[in-house]
Amino acid sequence: MAVFTAVTEAQLADWMRHYDLGEVVEFRGITSGIENSNFFLTTTRGEYVLTIFEKLTAQQLPFYLDLMRHLASHRVPVPDPMPRDDGALFGMLNGKPATIVTKLDGAPELAPGAAHCVEVGQMLARLHLAGRDFAHHQPNLRSLPWWQETVPSIAPFLSDARRTLLTEELAHQQAFFASADYASLPGGPCHCDLFRDNVLFAHAAPGTHHEVELGGFFDFYFAGCDKWLFDVAVTVNDWCVDLATGKLDEARVEAMLRAYQTVRPFTPAEARHWGDMLRAGAYRFWVSRLYDFHMPRAAELLKPHDPGHFERILRERLAGAAL
């Protein structure tokens, strides 16, 4: 279980004086937090989530919160940070930066079908287009430079076969990233972590033609500016796979890509390099999971994710399983 930063009633009351959100009705911790301390907050004005950032600093937060605010203003269903009385989107609570955002409706769908993939694909394309005029730029902090920095530190922990795969794929990605085709790929703000547990689905309204209804995307704290195709590949590698084998499910892949491209069609270069980007998306999470597994942070109480899952996905993509 995650360790939370406790908030007393007196601290909450003092904190809420800086917001025009009404009176507090209910306040309770969310025990599933991993990176941050999260609390459900109900007031006389509505339902919100209060987040205390355990790792991100006050200097790092503006990109993420401003991006969420920008997307919400463009009718992309994301948590909308609430401004304080001084206009800031966060303040300090118990010595740590904290924010209040709107609460999305729905629950994650951990066994998605094609209908869920359609909704996610369409909204991801809308998110990409909505971010085109976002004023700030921050690169995806878990892209090639981080891989190059991290691989030498984790390679000694691996078997010869895994170390060979790790270094050979890094060489392939370095060449891909240096190519003229890669430079031509369109991009902008990306979620970069749009897994099944970062999307909510609400019950479809009676009388609508939707089988499912998207509640929204959340957890933007790995977001960054990258090639849009990378964001699509990361999403497909989670939403459209058999979790036991890493194999792609053709029906779900087709549903997601067709839906995405009804909003933003791929360029010819994107179509040519879809397989390379599926590999890049798998590699990014294999590297980060290897790092978390073999080099855990001090006082980390959470069990790290299995690195083998994304190793299987990468090997599947290398074997030509990309559809």
From Swiss-Prot:
Main enzyme class: transferase
Pfam families, per database record: APH (PF01636)
InterPro entries cross-referenced by the UniProt entry: Aminoglycoside_PTrfase, Homoserine_kinase_II, Kinase-like_dom_sf, Pseudomonas-type_ThrB
An individual GO BP term: threonine biosynthetic process
Protein name: Homoserine kinase
Native source organism of the sequence: Paraburkholderia phymatum (strain DSM 17167 / CIP 108236 / LMG 21445 / STM815) (Burkholderia phymatum)
Enzyme Commission designation: 2.7.1.39
Keyword Nucleotide-binding carried by entry: yes
GO molecular function, one term: homoserine kinase activity
HAMAP family, per database record: Homoser_kinase_2
CDD domains for this protein: HomoserineK_II
Catalytic activity: L-homoserine + ATP = O-phospho-L-homoserine + ADP + H(+)
Gene3D superfamilies membership: 3.90.1200.10, Phosphorylase Kinase, domain 1 (3.30.200.20)
Pathway(s) per entry: Amino-acid biosynthesis; L-threonine biosynthesis; L-threonine from L-aspartate: step 4/5
